[in-house]
Regions:
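Catalytic-loop region of hydrolases
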Residues: 17-116, 437
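Primarily recognizes the serine-hydrolase "nucleophile elbow" in alpha/beta-hydrolase
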Residues: 193-265
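C-terminal catalytic histidine-bearing segment of alpha/beta-hydrolase fold enzymes
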Residues: 333-334, 351, 360, 367-458
């Protein structure tokens, strides 16, 4: 789906790249060290036996990340550079899965220089995998291996440069339950609760201004959190949520990407649902053809980039004894429907940005979602971008999202009604253009070793 995102994020620094003849001249590439322990083998991630005794958002344990937070190289993406933060933390906290069972997951807390501890952005990274070892808490670390997540650190750095504390939840939970979106939304909300409970550890205020941001798979968690907030976490006020590349309907995507370069989303999504719903697991066991079962289950061992490469162009409908199973079976359709967007109206103001040429999820479905939100009384600024597709809008839409989030953080944006615009490029938005030069300069300086964060406290 966004398999080239790391390379595309490097476009943020194109204005500076002519000065670089190789990565050796940019910052300090940390010497190789032992990779961080995989979450599947790391006792920190282990759920306690008395999990039910913890309230949602309660912190179970905490630590600094085993390895420094890192960003992918701009020219050679296999290289990684340390992100010079004031502090970083991992919190294991209690949340609730899609079946209303107690579970726990990890929150990464990133603190910039001159942080404003009363402004917190919850950033929902692209995970899109049924493998716990792909979680952002692991993938953000040095020597965790190439990933989309380390490309997204560039976006996170842009937020940190505003002085905001950024929190990044492992919203797919301890089993990698990709597409179990009630879990994802609740994990986001409980991550905010955990952040508010972490003052003695992280310095975060008890009642900070909170915003959300996510793209593609991250937009699912972001919008589900916004939908569930009034009922699941009414005390958690959200000043605004920015969501790009929204995916309102799961079954549509499963059918649309079959046989394309994004076909790897199918086994990852089906296996992710199986990790939450036993009936989906039973369907896989019964209907995946024996000669394809080992290959299908490879998705449980790989992350997004691996799945994209492994299954690119393959017709996954031919892996099962009923070609319509993956997107027409009544059980799959029912469970997928339970995890579609558009079930509750968000109270938080929304920025939704979507490519009209989105090749993963049709723009018409996001049009319908926004229309439904607005009819339910939500406040949505909706930007339809004519110049991009699903992948490229992840990059070109980021400056506008950042500018909008800054307005929400500062209480400057007082939009009270829905507004839809079809534009050539959201990158040409006045707010995006105003913020872009500083974003580019900060990103360049961060890569060459500047401490991340504003020079003065705002």
């Amino acid at each position: 789906m966004i398999s080239t995102m790391i390379c595309q994020l490097a476009l943020w620094l194109t204005l500076f790249s002519w000065t670089i003849s190789g990565d050796a001249g940019v910052g300090a590439v940390l010497e190789a060290r032992a990779p961080p322990p995989l979450p599947s083998a790391d006792g920190f991630y282990k759920l306690p036996d008395n999990l039910d005794s913890y309230a949602p958002g309660a912190i179970i344990r905490h630590r600094p990340p085993p390895n420094p937070i890192a960003v992918a190289g701009l020219i050679h993406s296999q290289n990684q550079y340390p992100v010079h933060l004031d502090a970083s933390y991992q919190l294991l906290y209690r949340t609730t899965d899609s079946l209303n069972n107690a579970t726990a997951t990890v929150l990464t807390v990133l603190v910039p220089r001159n942080a404003n501890f009363n402004k917190v952005l919850s950033y929902q990274a692209v995970d899109d995998a049924s493998n716990i070892n792909c979680a952002p808490s692991y993938a953000f670390q040095l020597d965790s291996g190439p990933s989309v997540a380390q490309g997204e650190v560039l976006l996170v750095e842009a937020a940190l440069e505003q002085g905001w504390v950024v929190i990044v939840p492992d919203y797919l939970g301890p089993k990698g339950a990709f597409l179990a979106n009630a879990l994802a939304g609740q994990a986001v909300l409980d991550g905010i609760r955990a952040a508010r409970n972490s003052g003695a550890i992280t310095g975060i205020g008890k009642n900070p201004t909170v915003t959300l941001w996510g793209y593609s798979g991250g937009s699912l968690a972001t919008l589900f959190a916004a939908e569930l907030q009034p009922s699941y976490a009414p005390e958690v006020a959200i000043a605004g949520a920015a969501a790009g590349g929204a995916v309102p309907n799961i079954t549509t995507v499963l059918g649309k990407v079959d046989g394309t370069g994004a076909a790897g989303l199918i086994p990852a999504g089906i296996l992710g649902l199986a990790h939450q719903y036993p009936e989906v697991d039973a369907l896989i066991q019964k209907h995946v053809l024996p000669q394809h079962k080992d290959e299908f289950y490879k998705a449980d061992k790989m992350c997004l980039l691996g799945n994209i490469n492994e299954f690119s162009g393959k017709n996954l409908s031919q892996f099962v004894d009923d070609p319509s199973l993956l997107y027409a079976n009544p059980t799959v359709v029912r469970i997928a429907g339970e995890n579609d967007l558009g079930q509750h109206a968000p109270k938080a103001p929304l920025l939704v940005y979507k490519a009209t040429k989105d090749e993963v999820s049709p723009v018409a479905e996001t049009d319908a979602l926004v229309d439904w939100y607005c009819k339910q009384g939500a406040t949505v600024q909706y930007l339809r971008d004519e110049s991009t597709n699903h992948e490229s809008l992840a990059v070109t839409g980021a400056p506008k999202a950042l500018a909008w989030l800054r307005g929400r953080m500062n209480g400057e944006d007082h939009q009270t009604a829905c507004e839809t615009k079809t534009v050539y490029s959201v990158l040409l938005d006045f707010g995006a253009l105003a913020i872009l030069p500083k974003v580019l300069l900060d990103a360049f300086l961060d890569v060459i070793g500047k401490r991340v964060g504003p020079f003065i406290k705002w």
